[in-house]
C-alpha cells in the first residue's frame, strides 16, 4: 500500500515538473505553447477574482451613498425641526424652477379671473337686453291686438305677421312680373290683329301665297321633308321660312319664361310650407298641440285649444292670421271668421291653382292646416317630377291659348299632371284649332299666333 502511494506521488511529481519546466523530449516551441496556456488560465482566474471584488466595491458604494443621503436628511430634520421636510426637500436649482412656475401660474390665474369677470358682465348685459326685448315684444303684441280688436287670450304675434308679410311681398313681386309678361303678349297679339285687319299695312305681303293664318297641319306639311325639296328657292319662300322660324323661337322663349316663373313660384311656396312646418313643430315641441291620432292618450281638445276657445264676436281679425302657441297669430291663408271663406292661391303661367274651402272658427283644429300643407307638398312634388322627366317637352309644348291668364291657371293643373312622362311634342301633334300667322320679317315683323 505504501509502495503504491509512493509510486503515485512520484508520477504526479514528474507530471507537475513536466508542466512547469516542459517536457525534455519536446522542442522549445512546444514548451512555450504549454507555458502560454498556463498563463491564460491564471489570467482568467485573476479576472474572476477582480470581477467579484468590483461587485463588492459597487455594493459598498451604493450603501455608502444611501447612508450619506439618510445622514443629510437627519441633519436637515434636526436643524429645521420638521419631520416632513425630507419629503419636500429640493436642491437649489430645482427650487428656482418651481418658483418660476408658480409665478407663471399666478399670472395665468389672474388673467383667467379677469376674463371670467368680463364674461360675467357681458352675460348680465345680454340678460338685461333679452329682458328688454321680451317686454318690448309683449307690449307690441298687446298693442297690435288692441288695435286689431282681438281678444286677450288670442294675442296676435308680430313675428307671424312679419313672416306673412314677407310671403305676400314675394307673391306680389311674382304677380307683377307675370302681369308685365301678359301685357307684352297682349301688345304683340294686338299688333298682329291690327295687321290682319289692315292688310295694306303689310304692303306686298297680302298677295303672297303663304300669308294669312295657317293650320298646324299646313305648317307641318310645309316643313316636312317630302315637300321641303319641292319648295322653290325664291326670296318669298326664304322670307316665309324666316318668319315661321322667328315665330317659333318667340313661342319657345315664352314657354321658357313661363317655366322660370313656375320654378320661382314653387320656391316661394316651398319656403311658405317650410315656415308652416316649423310653426307646427314649435307647437308640437311646446306641448300645446299633438298629432290628430292623439298620441298623448288623453283625448279631447288640447290645452292650447281649450285656452284659446271663446266667442267668435271679433270678425275684425287680421287677414291670414291665426292664434299661435304663445297667444300670437300663426300663419294661415284664410281669415279667422265664422263665415265660410274661399281663398284661392292661384299660380299663373301653367302652375297649380290651389283652392282651400274650409270653415274656420276661433278654435279651428290644426288638422286643416296639415291637410293644406300635405296638398301643397303633393302639388310641388308633381311639378318637380314633370320638370325632371321632360323639361324639353314642356318648353316645346303647344297649347290653344298663347298666354296664361289668372283665370286659366287653375285649369292648367290638369294639363301639367297629364304631361308627366310624355315625350316631347313635335309639329305633328299640334292641335287642330291652333293657327300660325306667317308674315315676312322685312315688312310686317310677324309672330306665331296659336
From Swiss-Prot:
It comes from the Eukaryota. The keyword Secreted does not apply. Residues 1-197, 259-286 form a coiled coil. Residues 290-358 are annotated as: Disordered. Residues 343-354 have a biased composition (Polar residues). Keywords: Coiled coil. Belongs to the CCDC149 family. This is Coiled-coil domain-containing protein 149-A. It comes from Danio rerio (Zebrafish). The gene is ccdc149a.
